Every structure is written in structure tokens, then in C-alpha cells.
Amino acid sequence: MTAAAHIDHDRDYPADYLATILKEVKTIAMVGASSDPTKFSYGVLRVLHETGYDMIPVNPNEAGSEIRGLRVYESLAAIGRPVDMVQVFRSSDALPGIAREAIAIGAKVLWAQLGVRNDEAARLAEAAGLKVVMNRCPKIELFRPFWKPRLNQGI
């Protein structure tokens, strides 16, 4: 994967940019994953895992336990195997540090969840060749192509 020339992270992402990411990534490390089924991160992890992505939960508060049968890691560095995408369920101010960790482990994509964006993190990741998505949910984007036909049918 090659990084986009420049993307304004305050605007909509081109549909083909998001589609390419979601088609090409196989392994996703979710920073801020929760074992609490009432948390949004749990639902997103569940759907992405059931869709076929190799999900790796990362949460220092739950390290060593399991979420949906998946081992939880303390940090990205602790994973010890290739990761295509780092998805972030943390506050915007945590993103630059997570971007540095994503770069260090050789991730190809940094994806920040809805409501999470940070220009410094975007610049760091893009300068290192990562694709960057901010303020978007991969679960929503994964199913977006199906919305329009259904809406047109009144479903």
C-alpha cells in the first residue's frame, strides 16, 4: 500500500481510498479494545472479526485476558507479528504516540475512530508512508456500499 499524496482529514475521504484499505488489510490491532459488550469498541471488534479480519485487541488494562477468545496485548510492540492496520479507540491527544508506535511496528494504516482526529498524528503517519483515516468507523465504512441500494428500495 502506498500513502495518499495529501488528504484533508476534515473532509470526506474518497470512497475508493476507504474501499482499498478495507480490501487490502487483513490484520487489525485495535488500541483501546474493551471486553465490555456495552462498549462501542467491543461491537466494532465483534463485527470486524466475524467479517473475517484477524483482530488483535490492545489494552494495557486488560492485557493477558481475552476478548471474544482473542488474546489482549499490553501494547502494539508486544504483539510480535505483522499488523496491517492500527485502529484507535482512544482520545485524540493519545494519537501522536499511537502513530509513533504504529510506525515502529510497520503498520500500513492508522485509522482513528469516530470523534478521534489529530493533525500531528496524521502528519507523522503520512510522512512514514502510512495511509491515514480519522473520525471514521471501519464497521460503518465496511457496510456503506450496501446502504444506497437499500435506501432506494425503501428498506
Could you tell me what each predicted segment is?
Residues 102-125:
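ADP-ribose/adenylate-binding Rossmann-like module
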Residues 36-38, 45-67:
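NAD(P)-binding Rossmann-fold cofactor-contacting core
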Residues 80-81, 119-142:
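Short acidic, glycine/proline-enriched helix-loop-strand junctions
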Residues 141-155:
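A charged, well-structured terminal subsegment
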